[in-house]
A protein has these predicted regions:
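PAS/LOV sensory domain surfaces, especially short acidic/polar patches at coil-to-helix junctions
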Residues: 202-214
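Glycine-centered C-terminal helix-capping/turn motifs at helix ends
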Residues: 216-218, 222
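Short, well-structured alpha-helical segments in soluble
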Residues: 23-35, 118-131
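Helix-enriched interaction subdomains in cytosolic or periplasmic regions
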Residues: 28-61
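Sensory modules in modular signal-transduction proteins
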Residues: 177-205
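Periplasmic-binding protein-like
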Residues: 36-43, 82-84, 131-139
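Carboxylate-rich, polar loop motifs that coordinate divalent cations or form catalytic acidic clusters
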Residues: 10, 35, 39, 48-49, ...
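Ser/Thr/Gly-rich flexible loops in soluble cytosolic domains mediating phosphotransfer, phosphorylation
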Residues: 2-7, 18-26, 48, 56-99, ...
Length: 222
């Protein structure tokens, strides 16, 4: 919804695909394979997308401590709050809460990227701990509902979404420039009168021109 609101402020075409984690990757597959310049997501979904689509820049929307503090303020003072999220998100909140003296969350659990399967266990532990309401992402909400605990979705702020979009725009510009430079290099190699062979950082041959091949015709046997 937030991205829909921001679309009129942005240049370029933005395609919105709904989905979380594996569903998000699956739902985005057809759009990405038709051709996109960059992907923007957040949390574990961004991590999974970066593992699947290694040739496309994946920009993760960050959640800053201010978003978390705003979420905590919306929850009543008498609530026993639990927070399940990725370690970088929780560390941000803990650092700011310590400075401001507003730490109202007694139960924390850290999740590493790729270990989202542990979320259900953490939600069960939160219930046993006496947590009234959980803060977290979509997976936390799903399991909280399953175990009868109230939950609040940790939203990204407008500023963090805009920042991710700007990062994506920069990544696209850099990538296009790299592609232009690569084309120039390929043209030079292809049309050079001397023999040229190109190696990657692992010393594997990636490209050679016809002049080089005429000097070493035995390479045609490989």
């Amino acid at each position: 919804e937030l991205v829909e609101e921001l679309k009129h402020e942005l240049q370029g075409k933005i395609i919105i695909v709904n989905g979380d984690m594996e569903n998000g990757v699956r739902n985005a597959k057809s759009v990405i394979e038709r051709g996109v310049d960059a992907i923007i997501s957040r949390g574990g979904t961004a991590y999974l997308l970066s593992q699947v689509y290694t040739r496309v820049p994946v920009i993760a929307i960050q959640i800053d401590a201010l978003n978390i503090l705003k979420t905590v303020r919306r929850i009543g003072e008498d609530k026993h709050i639990g927070f399940i999220s990725y370690s970088n998100v929780i560390y941000q909140y803990q650092a700011m809460a310590e400075v401001l003296g507003v730490n109202k969350i007694p139960y924390f659990q850290f999740v590493d990227y790729g270990e989202e399967y542990r979320i259900e266990q953490f939600v069960q532990e939160a219930k046993e701990y006496g947590v009234d309401i959980l803060i977290g992402g979509a997976h936390v909400q799903d399991y909280a509902k399953k175990y009868g605990i109230s939950s609040v979705f940790l939203e990204s702020g407008k500023d963090t979404v805009l920042k991710a979009i700007r990062e994506a725009e920069t990544a696209i510009i850099v990538r296009r420039k790299e592609q232009e430079n690569l084309k120039i290099i390929n043209d030079i190699v292809d049309h050079a009168y001397i023999g040229i062979v190109v190696f990657d950082k692992h010393c594997h041959v990636k490209k050679w021109n016809t002049t080089f091949l005429s000097m070493f015709p035995q390479l045609l046997q490989f």
